[in-house]
UniProtKB/Swiss-Prot annotation:
Its main location: cytoplasm. Belongs to the DeoC/FbaB aldolase family. DeoC type 1 subfamily. It comes from the Bacteria. This is Deoxyribose-phosphate aldolase. Pfam families: DeoC. It is found in: Cytoplasm.
């Protein structure tokens, strides 16, 4: 895989709360230079990013119910509609992890579907299951519920919890959702070796703040 192909699999990410206007402008400039799949930013920065990326192939991705997933489904649905109205092309939502652990699967599916329905095919929906907090059984169940609810992708992590993507989790997620659904690895992908390992195991998208280092074959210690 060459640098250009790899770049098209990466969501160039900055989700730090202290990200200012200059940070977003730099992120978008880099995304245009490398032709990354998208920039992934907090909702407050969607309008600016949409303006900076207008007319390019680079998509605007934002986060919903982030990073805890503990908002109500009504709030997540509103966030989704608002983000799309402001220019988002993709939304990465966090599941209700506590309800999953309660085995309240009906709620978890409805919560995901609320975002899928709010997106109304105007934006891709990615479902963050926060793998580091789940058992193997819970990871499988979360992926099954995301697929059943009609989401486009399952995603490993927020990057704000106790761990990120692992090749093993990506393999399990890919085996669970089958060949057609997207699988996004995020959190802890900081080198070309990390990227190749998750791609080999079934990732079709990578969320990273170390995107440039990955494409240039370097190692970064950067975090979201």
């Amino acid at each position: 895989m060459d640098k250009q192909q790899l770049a098209k699999m990466i969501d160039h990410t900055i989700l730090k709360p202290e990200a200012d206007k200059a940070s977003i402008e730099k992120l978008c400039k880099e995304a245009l230079e490398y032709n990354f799949a998208s920039v992934c930013i907090n909702p407050t920065n969607v309008e600016l990013a949409a303006k900076l990326l207008k007319g390019s192939e680079v998509k605007v991705c934002t986060v919903i119910g982030f990073p805890l997933g503990a908002n109500t489904m009504e709030v997540k649905a509103f966030e989704t509609k608002d983000a799309i109205a402001k220019g988002a092309d993709e939304v990465d939502m966090v599941i209700n992890i506590g309800r999953l652990k309660d085995k309240d699967y009906e709620y978890v599916e409805k919560d995901i579907k609320a975002v899928v329905d709010a997106a109304d095919k105007k934006a891709l929906t990615k479902v963050i299951i926060e793998t580091c907090l789940l058992t193997e059984e819970e990871k499988v169940k979360a992926c099954e519920l995301a697929k059943k609810a009609g989401a486009d992708f399952v995603k490993t992590s927020t990057g704000f919890s106790t761990g990120g993507a692992t090749p093993e989790d990506i393999k399990l997620m890919r085996e669970t959702v089958g060949p057609d659904m997207g699988v996004k690895a995020s959190g802890g992908v900081r080198s070309i070796e990390d990227a190749e390992a998750v791609i080999k195991n079934g990732a079709t998208r990578i969320g990273a703040s170390a995107s440039i280092a990955i494409c240039e074959g370097k190692v970064s210690d950067s975090t979201y």
